[in-house]
C-alpha cells in the first residue's frame, strides 16, 4: 500500500504507520465525511430517516458506482444512506448532499468547514462522492481522525456499515453486495468503507472490536490506501488488525470515575482535591 495506519480508536493512539501525512486521493472514502454530515443533520433533526428526497438529473447521471435511482423516484433518506454506504452509490450520495446542503456546491463547503473544525489539515474536498478531481485530497492520518469521530459521535448509525447486501425496491439486482470483504470473513469487523479509482488505487478503512485481556471491546481502526487490488487491500487491512490485537497489550492503570489521589489544598475552598479520570 502507498500509505497505511493502525490506530487504537478507543485511545486515539497510532500503533503502526507509513506515509500517513502524504497527500492521497480518497476515492469513495470521501463518503465518510458525507455520512458524518448526514448523520449530523439527522441528529439535529434537519432531516429524518423516513423523509423522502428527490433525485435530481445530476444525481441520476452520476458515473461510477450507483444504486440506480432516477428522477421519477422520491427516495427515503434511510434508503439513500444504505445506497451510499453499502453500494457506494454516487447517485445516492449526490441526492443526500443536495438534500442536506441545498446544493452539491454548498454541501462541499460544509464538508471543508467540518474538516477544518476537526483539524484535518491535509484534507480538501471538491465533491461529496470522491470521483477524481484536481484539489480533492486527504491523508491517512486525517481519514483515521475522521473515522474515529464518526464512530464516537454517531454510534447509533454504525449498524449501516455492517449491512452485507442491499438493493432498493425497483432497481436492478446488481452492485448490491457490500464491498468490504472483511465483513464476510471476520465477525469482529463492523465497518467501515472501501474506495477505488484508477488514481487512488484500492483503499479501505476497517474497524473491529475485540477483547484485550482484562479490557473487553477494544476498538482498532486500520487505514489502507493505494493497494494494488481488492484482495491486497483486504489482506493488508486484516493483517494490520490481527497484528494490533496480538502485538499490543492494553493495561488499565486505574478505573475511570474513581479518585486515584486526594492531595491537600492550602487555603482552598476545599481541604483536598480528588484527582483521577473523570469518565467511568
Model segments located where?
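Active-site-adjacent loops and short helices of periplasmic peptidoglycan-processing enzymes
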Residues: 1-155
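Domain-terminus/edge residues, biased toward the C-terminal soluble/receptor-binding domains
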Residues: 121, 132-280
Amino acid at each position: 500500500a502507498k500509505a497505511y495506519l493502525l490506530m487504537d480508536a478507543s485511545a486515539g493512539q497510532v500503533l503502526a504507520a507509513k506515509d500517513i501525512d502524504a497527500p492521497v486521493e480518497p476515492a469513495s472514502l470521501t463518503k465518510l465525511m458525507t455520512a458524518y454530515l448526514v448523520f449530523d443533520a439527522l441528529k439535529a433533526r434537519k432531516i429524518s430517516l423516513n423523509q423522502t428526497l428527490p433525485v435530481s438529473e445530476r444525481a441520476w447521471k452520476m458515473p461510477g458506482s450507483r444504486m440506480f435511482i432516477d428522477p421519477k423516484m422520491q427516495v427515503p433518506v434511510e434508503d439513500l444512506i444504505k445506497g451510499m454506504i453499502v453500494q457506494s452509490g454516487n447517485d445516492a450520495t449526490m441526492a443526500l448532499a443536495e438534500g442536506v446542503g441545498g446544493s452539491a456546491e454548498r454541501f462541499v463547503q460544509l464538508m471543508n468547514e467540518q474538516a477544518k473544525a476537526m483539524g484535518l489539515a491535509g484534507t480538501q474536498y471538491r465533491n461529496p462522492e470522491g470521483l477524481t478531481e484536481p484539489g480533492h485530497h486527504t491523508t491517512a492520518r486525517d481519514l483515521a481522525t475522521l473515522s474515529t469521530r464518526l464512530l464516537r459521535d454517531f454510534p447509533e448509525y454504525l449498524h449501516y456499515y455492517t449491512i452485507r447486501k442491499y438493493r432498493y425496491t425497483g432497481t436492478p439486482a446488481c452492485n448490491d453486495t457490500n464491498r468490504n470483504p472483511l465483513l464476510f470473513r471476520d465477525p469482529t469487523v463492523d465497518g467501515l468503507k472501501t474506495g477505488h479509482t484508477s488514481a487512488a488505487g484500492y483503499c479501505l478503512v476497517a474497524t473491529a472490536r475485540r477483547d484485550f485481556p482484562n479490557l473487553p471491546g477494544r476498538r482498532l481502526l486500520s487505514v489502507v490506501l493505494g493497494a494494488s487490488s481488492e484482495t491486497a487491500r483486504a489482506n493488508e487491512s486484516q493483517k494490520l488488525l490481527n497484528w494490533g490485537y496480538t502485538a499490543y497489550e492494553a493495561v488499565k492503570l486505574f478505573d475511570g470515575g474513581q479518585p486515584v489521589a486526594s492531595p491537600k489544598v492550602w487555603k482552598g475552598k476545599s481541604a483536598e482535591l480528588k484527582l483521577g479520570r473523570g469518565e467511568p
